[in-house]
C-alpha cells in the first residue's frame, strides 16, 4: 500500500515540475532566477555526492595498507 502511495506522490511531483517547466518562458524574472538557483543547487549536491562516492570507492585518499613486516634472519654460512 505504501509503495503505491509513494509512486503516486512521485508522479504528482513530476507533473508539477513539468507544469513549472512549461510555464517558465512566461514567468517573471524573479521566478526564473529562483528556479535556476534551485536547479543549480540540486545539481551541485548531486555532483558532490557522486565525487564523494567515487573517492570512497577508489580509496584515493587512503594509503594502501601493507601486510605484516617479516623479519629477515641471516642465513648460516
Swiss-Prot record:
It is found in: Membrane. This is Small integral membrane protein 5. Signal peptide: none annotated. The chain crosses the membrane at residues 32-52. The gene is SMIM5. It comes from Homo sapiens (Human). Keywords: Membrane, Transmembrane, Transmembrane helix. The keyword Transmembrane helix applies. It holds the Pfam family SMIM5_18_22. One of its GO terms (cellular component) is membrane. It is a single-pass membrane protein. It comes from the Eukaryota. The keyword Ligase does not apply.
Amino acid at each position: 500500500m505504501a509503495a503505491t502511495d509513494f509512486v503516486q506522490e512521485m508522479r504528482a511531483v513530476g507533473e508539477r515540475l513539468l507544469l513549472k517547466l512549461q510555464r517558465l518562458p512566461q514567468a517573471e524574472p524573479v521566478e526564473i532566477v529562483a528556479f535556476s538557483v534551485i536547479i543549480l543547487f540540486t545539481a551541485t549536491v548531486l555532483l558532490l555526492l557522486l565525487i564523494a562516492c567515487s573517492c570512497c570507492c577508489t580509496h584515493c585518499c587512503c594509503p594502501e595498507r601493507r601486510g605484516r613486516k617479516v623479519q629477515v634472519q641471516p642465513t648460516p654460512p
